[in-house]
Amino acid sequence: RDPNLLVGFDKSDDASVYKVSDDLALVQTVDFFPPIADDPYLFGQIAATNALSDVYAMGGEPKLCLNIMAVPESMPKEAVHQLLRGGYNKVYEAGALITGGHSILDDEPKYGLAVTGFVHPDRVLTNSGARPGDVLLLTKPIGIGVLTTAQKAEMLSAEGRALAEELMTTLNKSARDAMVKYRVHACTDVTGFGLLGHSYEMAQGSDVELELEVDAIDL
């Protein structure tokens, strides 16, 4: 194994990290998925926010992004434009750049980003550094997946939909910026596996036990 590969895929971390010099390491990740919103602009925002979060979870700052997109031939050009605009605006908000990308034809739209960020090699955060006595903090409420599932079944209220959209398009930049000011030992991005799944990965990777106070979890 290359000694400069600080984080690989052996412990299910959010991104890989490669040491370039004594004070610089690259953080790389890729994430894309089918639409979870009917509005293409909103979908672009959600997908970009999700991809950028993997770099934030490693303690890094995203800098360079590549679009990854699949679209049907029948998709209107304006919808494609709005999709890309949604992604671009979130990348711009993060202080990063879109420098290219790749697109293919597919029956179902898909969109996301390949993201490269920077972090100091001594300040990399992983999901396997938790220690006994640490306090587990959530930066967003959980349950967004439940809301999006309800939306697909047309069972979600307007208030619930607005809340889900706000949370899914809020960058974790401010959480990352606050986190790096303190002695945080471990971090992960809670997404598809939910709180329990990602807590299990953190506990297993860190060789510790996690105790969740259910009443304190923001839903």
Where do the PLM segments sit?
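Helix-biased detector of long, well-ordered alpha-helical tracts
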Residues: 1-219
